[in-house]
Amino acid sequence: MADLTQILHALILGFVEGFTEFLPISSTGHLILAGQLLGFNGEKAKVFMIAIQLAAILAVVWEYRVRLRHVVSTVHTEPASRRLVVNLMAGFLPAAVLGFLFYKEIKGYLFNPIVVASALVIGGVLILWAERRKHVVSTPTVDDLGWRRALAVGFAQALAMVPGTSRSGATIIGGLFLGLSRKAAAEFSFLLAIPTMFAATAYDLYKNWQLFDAGDIPLFAIGGVASFASALFAVRTLIKFVSRHDYTVFAWYRIVFGGVVLATAYSGLVDWGVTH
């Protein structure tokens, strides 16, 4: 049975996953750093991360349930539905292939706080650069997106296999570079998350199924509920936010947060579990 400390950790990490999964600030990076600070790492933490990520995906499915139901029921009759399915397949492909080929290397060498912090800073600088460019909109809605640009967004998404990069950040900023409107870039990022994250979660489950323990189910449920609720809030909030604002605030957050982690790591003020 989970004790109070474990329950608190589950709630904190669930909220961290949900809030950060669909913001351009890297959920994986935040989970690695939060887990290190809380001392919640190791095999149980690895399985727990899979569970709360699944809950975050389900929040997007719930938010877009009407649209997804319509696409599934009309994919054989409506060109717009077929186009969205093709675009999602094109966007999913790069990360699927590269993730399968380099799964062991990514999990073994890149999942550490210094990589995360460095990627946060670099990603923040790239977002600032993207926001200072003149943004010409050639694709105002997701329905206007073609498969070639969807594939290009998919290659941007593949960069997010480096923890700290941010899947949503890479796809949204990639979409802006390719001429998508802010809302279209955010919506396509959310929709692309569904096949991408389901596949990644399923593959993680396949690789780590032996680590599951029935006794941990209550803890997973607590974290999952927190992740689902906060992810739903984050998705709805970001869609409203991007219709009126740019991503500069997220860029500065990444730079400051990543800089603090690097400074505390190399000064020895915080033990991030790495040697230097």
From Swiss-Prot:
Membrane topology: Multi-pass membrane protein
TM ranges: 7-27, 42-62, 84-104, 110-130, 185-205, 215-235, 255-275
Cellular location(s): Cell inner membrane
Enzyme class: hydrolase
Domain of life: Bacteria
InterPro entries on file: UppP
EC number annotated for this UniProt entry: 3.6.1.27
Location (main, coarse): membrane
Catalytic activity: di-trans,octa-cis-undecaprenyl diphosphate + H2O = di-trans,octa-cis-undecaprenyl phosphate + phosphate + H(+)
GO biological process: cell wall organization; peptidoglycan biosynthetic process; regulation of cell shape; response to antibiotic
Pfam families linked to this entry: BacA (PF02673)
GO cellular component terms given for this protein: plasma membrane
Keyword annotations from UniProtKB, A to Z: Antibiotic resistance, Cell inner membrane, Cell membrane, Cell shape, Cell wall biogenesis/degradation, Hydrolase, Membrane, Peptidoglycan synthesis, Transmembrane, Transmembrane helix
Molecular functions (GO terms): undecaprenyl-diphosphatase activity
Family (UniProt): Belongs to the UppP family.
NCBIfam families: PRK00281.1-2, PRK00281.1-4, undec_PP_bacA
General remark: Bacitracin is thought to be involved in the inhibition of peptidoglycan synthesis by sequestering undecaprenyl diphosphate, thereby reducing the pool of lipid carrier available.
Function: Catalyzes the dephosphorylation of undecaprenyl diphosphate (UPP). Confers resistance to bacitracin.
Name this polypeptide is given: Undecaprenyl-diphosphatase
Organism placement in taxonomy: Bacteria, Pseudomonadati, Pseudomonadota, Betaproteobacteria, Nitrosomonadales
Gene: uppP
